[in-house]
């Protein structure tokens, strides 16, 4: 196919997408066709360095050769069987999640895992489990506490604890009995009462603008949950699985329920909800379920991904690259202190706070071969692959700095 035929083909494809896709996303007229490691290519063979990783998903890079091999091999053996039967990979993944978590010092008391297909499903399970535990204690123990700027998903339960009018308003009324506190304010623990069954919080908020929870805040939540018998849920769908340079973003304070997804499948759909023995003991056969969750294909991929993101090599790389990015952004921040006001986050979940809308910077970066995304209000979010190499990082940072310098006066 010659170049002009390809252009016509992909132009037609964009028209097809506009005609047949439910319009839930605003997308640039770029069609991505292949990826390798930290790089992506579009239909015109333009090459991009990916600092978005599919929104913190492709933690081990695009088209990871070992994952590609696993997908081919397992799909030729067994992709799916119902959860009326066991398969050989789901229990292996569940065991590894618990053992690696305990080994890392995360989630004291982690014991059992429910496997699902996505982050929002993992959170739905967490909310249901917390409600079940609560109502066994008291029929009035049904309420939830969440926090400003949180994002927990778009299905009805997860949406109900995502306090953003942009997402919630079209679908009201939502699940009742949800109270919203101020993130990082220990006084928010006062919202937790005898009627509270669950408190859900991100140790590092991603979508809300990349804000890291402090220990005092999380400890206040833990103390009040213990006092009233509520379940503390940590949503680590974006910030977990090595993204902070530790297996889990939480450190000194530990949850009753931990949710994860995104990086666990490196692009293949999977989610998981890990619970303590005390929670698992309250869940009976038939209380919850899933058609595809825990299928052997997703579970085998997840088993491999976990072995890599928990490794010292990958976690050390996260810390090294994080500092490299911070140093580069600090250089530009010195030039434009009124434009770049702060760099937030942890590991390779970083947010560059602009005083003005940075959309021109994002567009300029893309035009010059770097993909970055936004979060919250005027925040550019950087979430590259955890195993990104030095060459790609250096090249990407040069493009980012140029995009900022070239557009600083026009923002």
UniProtKB/Swiss-Prot annotation:
InterPro entries: AcOrn/SuccOrn_fam (IPR004636), Aminotrans_3 (IPR005814), Aminotrans_3_PPA_site (IPR049704), Class-III_PLP-dep_AT (IPR050103), PyrdxlP-dep_Trfase (IPR015424), PyrdxlP-dep_Trfase_major (IPR015421), PyrdxlP-dep_Trfase_small (IPR015422)
Keyword list, A-Z: Amino-acid biosynthesis, Aminotransferase, Arginine biosynthesis, Mitochondrion, Pyridoxal phosphate, Transferase, Transit peptide
Catalytic reaction annotation: N(2)-acetyl-L-ornithine + 2-oxoglutarate = N-acetyl-L-glutamate 5-semialdehyde + L-glutamate
Ranges that cross the membrane: none
One function term, GO molecular function aspect: N2-acetyl-L-ornithine:2-oxoglutarate 5-aminotransferase activity
Domain of life: Eukaryota
Cofactor: pyridoxal 5'-phosphate
Pfam families per the UniProt record, alphabetical: Aminotran_3
Alphabetized HAMAP family for the sequence: ArgD_aminotrans_3
Descriptive protein name: Acetylornithine aminotransferase, mitochondrial
Gene expressing this chain: ARG8
């Amino acid at each position: 196919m010659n170049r002009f035929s390809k252009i016509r083909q992909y132009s037609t494809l964009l028209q097809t997408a506009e005609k047949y896709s439910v319009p839930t996303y605003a997308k640039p007229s770029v069609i991505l066709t292949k990826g390798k490691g930290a790089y992506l290519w579009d239909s015109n063979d333009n090459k991009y360095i990916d600092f978005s990783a599919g929104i913190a998903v492709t933690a081990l890079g695009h088209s990871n050769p070992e994952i590609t091999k696993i997908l081919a091999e397992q799909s030729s053996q067994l992709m799916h069987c119902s959860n009326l039967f066991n398969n050989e990979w789901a229990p292996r993944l569940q065991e590894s999640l618990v053992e690696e978590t305990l080994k890392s010092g995360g989630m004291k008391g982690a014991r059992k895992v429910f496997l699902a297909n996505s982050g929002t499903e993992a959170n739905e399970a967490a909310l249901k489990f917390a409600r079940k535990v609560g109502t066994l204690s008291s029929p009035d123990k049904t309420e939830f506490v969440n926090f400003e700027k949180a994002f927990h998903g778009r299905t009805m339960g997860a949406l109900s604890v995502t306090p953003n009018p942009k997402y919630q308003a079209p679908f009201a009324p939502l699940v009742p009995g949800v109270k919203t506190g101020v993130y990082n304010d220990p006084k928010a623990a006062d919202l937790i009462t005898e009627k509270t069954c669950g408190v859900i919080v991100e140790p590092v908020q991603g979508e809300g603008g990349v804000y890291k929870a402090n220990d005092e805040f999380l400890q206040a939540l833990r103390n009040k949950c213990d006092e009233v018998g509520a379940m503390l849920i940590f949503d680590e769908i974006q910030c977990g699985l090595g993204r902070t340079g530790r297996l889990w973003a939480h450190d000194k304070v530990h949850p009753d329920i931990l949710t994860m997804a995104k990086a666990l499948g490196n692009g293949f759909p999977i989610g998981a909800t890990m619970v303590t023995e005390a929670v698992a003991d309250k869940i009976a056969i038939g209380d919850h379920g899933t058609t595809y969750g825990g299928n052997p294909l997703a579970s085998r991929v997840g088993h491999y991904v976990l072995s890599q993101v928990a490794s010292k090599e990958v976690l050390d790389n996260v810390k090294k690259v994080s500092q490299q990015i911070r140093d580069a952004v600090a250089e530009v921040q010195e030039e434009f202190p009124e434009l770049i006001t702060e760099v937030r986050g942890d590991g390779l979940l970083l947010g560059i706070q602009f005083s003005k809308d940075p959309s021109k910077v994002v567009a300029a970066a893309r035009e010059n071969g770097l993909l970055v995304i936004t979060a919250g209000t005027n925040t550019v979010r950087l979430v590259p692959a955890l195993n990104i190499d030095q060459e790609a990082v250096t090249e990407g940072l040069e493009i980012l700095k140029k995009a900022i310098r070239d557009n600083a006066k026009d923002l």
